[in-house]
A protein has these predicted regions:
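Tandem CBS (Bateman) regulatory domains
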Residues: 1-10, 48-78, 82-94, 103, ...
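Basic, Lys/Arg-rich alpha-helical nucleic-acid-recognition elements, primarily the DNA-binding modules
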Residues: 1-13, 17-40, 45-50, 56-57
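Short phosphate-binding/catalytic loops that engage adenosine nucleotides
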Residues: 32, 156, 195
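Conserved short beta-strand edge segments in small beta-sheet-based binding/regulatory domains
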Residues: 159-161, 191-202
Length: 202
């Protein structure tokens, strides 16, 4: 899944010669927290809500323009970046959004934490009418296929699977999200097969 599928394409932007107050007004008007700074269609900087909070603690803000407070070399991604990779960039850099640019730094869009969350919710099927069963598979390297087959053989349809990040394999929990079904029956089937069902949500 690519960034281009989830980014905001109609991006509100500003030029570096504008005042801080103009920037604040734009952010309030459009309810945004990240404002790309452009020059001739190319990205030259980024202003965030956090940057502005710090500036308002200083005096003489009326003498400042965007170029005085913007991030001059913001981290960016391309539209072909995988959504998972964009999520990693945001997580590791502790930032709230990424401008999306082409090879010539032309601004194409912006992708934020909210956009990425929406993508993962779609991938996981969280908002759909689903059931979930959480299972510890143990050490058997073929356990995932065996459990998946047991679920399918009993009429279950797997929507997505998540895995806990436990470093010890036998303690990892597998979160099977299924199309709405009799998950209690499936839990009993898996337990009879020797697997530990941690929880189930109908």
């Amino acid at each position: 899944m690519k960034v281009s599928e989830w980014m905001t394409k109609d991006v509100i932007s500003i030029t570096k010669d504008r005042s801080i107050q103009e920037c604040v007004n734009l952010m309030k008007k459009h309810s945004i927290r990240h404002l790309p700074v452009v020059e001739d269609g190319k990205l030259v900087g980024l202003v965030t809500e956090g940057d502005l909070r710090q500036i308002f603690l200083a005096s003489l803000i009326e003498d400042l323009t965007i170029k005085d407070v913007m991030i001059s070399d913001p981290i960016t991604v391309s539209p072909d970046t995988e959504i998972e990779d964009a999520a990693k960039v945001i997580f590791y850099n502790k930032i709230g959004g990424l401008p999306v640019v082409d090879e010539e730094d032309r601004l194409l869009g912006i992708i934020t934490v909210a956009d990425i969350l929406a993508a993962f919710i779609e991938i996981m099927g969280v908002l759909k009418a689903t059931s979930r069963i959480d299972v510890i598979l143990g050490d058997d390297p073929e356990a995932f296929e065996k459990v998946s087959s047991l679920i399918r053989d009993r009429g279950g349809e797997i929507v997505s699977v998540g895995i806990s990040g436990h470093r010890i394999r036998r303690k990892r929990v597998y979160y099977f999200r299924l199309k709405k079904c009799n998950v209690r029956h499936l839990a009993k089937v898996l337990e009879r097969a020797g697997y530990q069902v941690v929880s189930s949500v109908a």
